[in-house]
A protein has these predicted regions:
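Alpha-helical recognition segments enriched in aromatics with Gly/Pro capping
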Residues: 24-31, 140-142, 148-151, 159-248
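Residue patterns forming the tRNA-binding/recognition surfaces of aminoacyl-tRNA synthetases
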Residues: 2-162, 179-181, 246-247
């Protein structure tokens, strides 16, 4: 028997377990890494500050709740750029519902000849059977902008082409023939519909979304060369060669 602490919003395993047993989900830490208001002596203090941990131990001891304390060395995640300490943090994200495509992907996998053969039901097959919904949005500057615009009331527009973007733009001149559809230029395009203004959400797509779109994007599908894809002339591929890491 034993006891282990859990922090629902600050670790994947913690979050999944919390969902299973119905633990409440709320944040005690803000995006800047400091504790939220209402956390007594922790309020506005940095969660990674060593003195904060010491003060928590002192508080537990003062209230007669401390069983034991011990220092031990362990690994801890840091930002590879600035070397700052980082924490896991549950946030809202945009997902693709891959779990709804699981059965179709498994059926498609049956028609593929794999070399080596064991990957079909092994490494790749197991990944397909356990496929998770894909959190594909990223909070980065560079990347394919998520084509979603949002109004203040939460209403959203998903734009499917430059032509549609131009037709909805408050200032159509921003979407000329030579406009740059990347950040920061696309962020300045305001859309108007039903008397409401829409601002683009700041997220970009995971670069693997771009990679997955390659078979279609190289032909400018669906705006051109539709027959190559729709009639199976250029998709799916007859042969694909990948490194082992591409089989997940």
């Amino acid at each position: 028997t034993g006891v282990v602490h859990t922090a629902v919003m600050y670790g994947q395993d913690d979050f999944e377990l919390g969902n299973q047993v119905g633990l409440p989900k709320f944040h005690l830490v803000k995006l800047d890494g400091t504790y939220v208001a209402g956390t007594d002596f922790l309020e506005e203090r940095l969660v990674t500050d060593e003195q904060v941990a010491i003060d928590i131990i002192k508080d537990l001891a003062h209230r007669g709740l401390l069983f034991a304390k011990e220092k031990y060395e362990h690994s801890y995640p840091h930002c590879w750029r600035c070397k700052s300490k980082v924490i896991y943090y549950a946030k809202d994200s945009w997902y693709i519902a891959m779990s709804q495509l699981r059965n179709d992907m498994l059926a498609q996998n049956e028609d593929i000849h794999w070399e080596p053969e064991h990957l079909k039901e092994g490494r790749f097959g197991e990944w397909l059977r356990e496929v998770k919904d894909w959190a594909f949005s990223r909070e980065r500057y560079w990347g394919t902008p998520l084509p979603v615009w949002e109004a203040q009331d939460g209403d959203r527009l998903c734009v499917g082409s430059f032509e549609e973007l131009r037709s909805l733009a408050k200032d159509p001149s921003r979407v000329g023939d030579d406009f740059d559809p990347h950040r920061p230029f696309v962020d300045a395009i305001v859309l108007v519909k039903d008397g409401k203004e829409f601002q683009r959400v700041k997220d970009v797509c995971d670069v693997w979304f771009d990679s997955g779109a390659m078979p279609f994007a190289q032909w400018h599908y669906p705006f051109e060369n539709k027959e190559l894809i729709d009639l199976g002339q250029a998709y799916p591929a007859d042969f694909i060669s990948e490194a082992i890491d591409q089989t997940r």
